[in-house]
A protein has these predicted regions:
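Short loop/turn motifs that connect adjacent beta-strands in outer-membrane beta-barrel proteins
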Residues: 22-29, 40-49, 61-65, 113, ...
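Outer membrane beta-barrel transmembrane domains
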Residues: 65-67, 71-84, 247-389
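Extracellular loop and loop/strand-boundary signature of outer-membrane beta-barrel proteins
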Residues: 39-40, 88-92, 139-146, 204-209, ...
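Residue-level detector of the transmembrane beta-barrel scaffold of outer-membrane proteins
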Residues: 51-53, 115-117, 157, 173-177, ...
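Outer-membrane pore/translocation modules
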Residues: 121-245, 316, 370
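Residues on the lipid-exposed face of transmembrane beta-strands in outer-membrane beta-barrel proteins
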Residues: 41-43, 54-56, 104-108, 118, ...
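Surface-exposed strand-loop-strand hairpins of Gram-negative outer-membrane beta-barrel proteins
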Residues: 25-28, 60-99
């Protein structure tokens, strides 16, 4: 699938469309004309207008990796302790994970240079776990599924235009992105699906929680250029984790770099290709219940005993990843855009063992609503002329 996606990315960007014309883009001309919907992009939207985005997203993870090397689940399963010594084996290991998200973003352009918005998120996690032979005998099951779902963290965001070569129809512009993630997602989710009743009151591991538990600032720099029918851009974003949450840990800092190119081959359609690079650090600290042994240890309430699964080790989080993404945008009606994109990893180096990403898919419905103060506001539809048309 990875090779096929890269092939089509190259083919669609290289192919010649003889019917291409000079377009101003599917979005408003002031914001740059075209911009990606799955990442922050473009400039500042038309002044005094609202923007809304509804984006369901699905990500699939499958198989384990340590660094760049694939490892099998069976190689990690076994007796965690033998003759009083830890073996490095685990009672259960993850084999796959499905993550579903629904994002709703609302924003408003306050001036020619300033845009503000808020993004609300709902998340559903499902992770398949395989048991060791000992646990299979104890539970009578070969595996089980950990689940969590609910409201995730909320993002407040803003963009300030630093530079533009034209105030109305820019072909080059740069913007400053700034944001603050609010800890509205739960960090108290429990392992209620575990087949052993004594484990059902334990907390879920870090990656199955719904939020970070901290207020996390984000800052970024966005650049976009265009020469119709082509658009391109680069976005660099950094998210800092500055302190431990109420459960005595904090997620690792994150850095993201996105490069994108777009080709508008019709007045209401375009194709896009992206390279999405990301780095995220290890978890700092340790969950309070893991420190006391109440959750995540082979011997309950004994924090000196080994972890039940590699998911409880804070060092098994973080890494580097590069995705190749191919997308399509369609404008079915004025002020509306439908965006579909699919991304697959072309490189992953993980602080493992941890699950590898297989692919992700996102569908976005984007709507622009001019207010009465916008230059694009239309008071009423034009009637028929005296000639009847």
């Amino acid at each position: 699938m990875r090779k096929t996606l890269v092939y089509w990315m190259v083919l669609l960007l290289a192919v010649y469309f003889p019917s291409a014309h000079a377009y101003i883009g599917l979005c408003c001309a002031k914001c740059g004309g075209n911009m990606p919907m799955n990442i922050p992009g473009g400039g500042i939207p038309e002044t005094k207008e609202f923007r809304f985005k509804l984006s369901p997203m699905y990500m699939s993870m499958d198989g384990l990796a340590d660094g760049a090397d694939t490892i099998s689940a069976n190689s990690l399963l076994g007796m965690p302790v033998m003759m009083g010594q830890p073996t490095g084996k685990f009672m259960a290991v993850p084999t796959s994970m499905d993550m579903k998200m629904l994002n709703f973003t609302a924003g408003y352009s306050f001036s020619d240079d300033l845009f503000g918005g808020v993004m609300l998120m709902y998340k559903s996690n499902s992770m398949d776990m395989k048991f060791s032979p000992m646990m299979q005998t104890t539970t009578g099951q070969t595996d089980f599924t950990m689940e969590s779902s609910g409201v995730a963290d909320t993002m407040l965001m803003g963009k300030y235009r630093l530079f533009s070569d034209d105030p109305l129809v820019p072909t080059r512009e740069a913007s400053l992105m700034f944001g603050l993630s609010l800890p509205t997602g739960s960090i108290d989710e429990q392992n209620s699906n575990h087949p052993l009743a004594m484990r059902q009151g334990e907390r879920l591991p870090y990656g199955m929680q719904l939020g970070s538990g901290t207020y996390d600032p984000t800052v970024g720099l966005l650049y976009q250029g265009s020469k119709s029918p082509y658009w391109w851009g680069a976005n660099a974003m950094y998210t800092a984790r500055l302190y431990n949450n109420d459960r005595d840990y904090r997620l690792g800092d994150e850095f993201r770099l996105d490069l994108y190119g777009m080709f508008q081959f019709r007045y209401n359609m375009l194709v896009e290709a992206q390279l999405n690079g990301s780095y995220w650090g290890k978890i700092h600290g340790e969950m309070d219940e893991a420190k006391t042994g109440a959750s995540g240890h082979v011997t309950k309430n004994d924090p000196t005993s080994p972890y039940t699964t590699p998911l409880w080790d804070p060092n098994n989080y973080g890494g580097r990843k590069l995705l190749a993404t191919l997308g399509f945008q369609w404008q079915p009606a004025p002020f509306n855009i439908i965006d579909f994109n699919i991304g697959v990893p072309v490189y992953q180096h993980l602080n493992g063992p941890q699950l590898k990403e297989k692919y992700q898919v996102m569908l976005t419905w984007y709507v622009e609503i001019p207010t009465r103060a916008s230059i694009r506001y239309v008071k009423q539809k034009a009637g028929e002329s005296s000639l009847g048309f």
